[in-house]
Design a protein with these regions (language model features):
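Glycine- and acidic-residue-biased ligand/ion/polar-headgroup-sensing regions
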Residues: 49-60, 65
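Conserved short histidine dyad/triad with adjacent acidic residue
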Residues: 32-46
Length: 123
């Protein structure tokens, strides 16, 4: 894989219903630009990966463990390994950046989705 790429050239993969990601995998971590449809839900789940994230556009109600908060552009999260979490997306949808360590190898073979990136918008 090339060291330098444009996000529009990264394949979009289905992660959940209404949730798709463009992921770049390194040796030790995964960076994902995640597109969440309006009013979609990421059901409660947990994984071995530590996860950090940032809202780029839109709004979410995010629950990590026992903490719930409404987040909009600029909001961040930190999810330790194996902590249950879930997301409810606002009516305008959302774009977020997620970082996972170790790599999300389970995301490498997800079903492909054919559509143009929602972010960044063409100039």
């Amino acid at each position: 894989m090339a060291a330098l790429r444009e996000v529009r050239d990264v394949e979009l993969q289905q992660v959940w219903d209404g949730v798709a990601a463009r992921s770049v995998h390194g040796e030790r971590l995964t960076l994902a630009l995640v597109e969440l449809d309006p009013n979609s839900v990421v059901p409660e789940h947990s994984h071995d990966h530590e996860q950090l994230g940032l809202v780029v556009h839109g709004s979410l109600r995010f629950r990590v463990g026992d903490e719930t908060r409404d987040l909009s552009a600029g909001g961040t999260w930190r999810i330790p390994s194996n902590v249950p979490h879930e997301v409810h997306v606002g009516p305008e949808g959302a774009i977020v950046v997620d970082v996972f360590a170790p790599t999300r190898d389970d995301w490498r073979e997800r079903d492909r989705v054919e559509r143009a990136p929602r972010w960044p918008r063409p100039s």
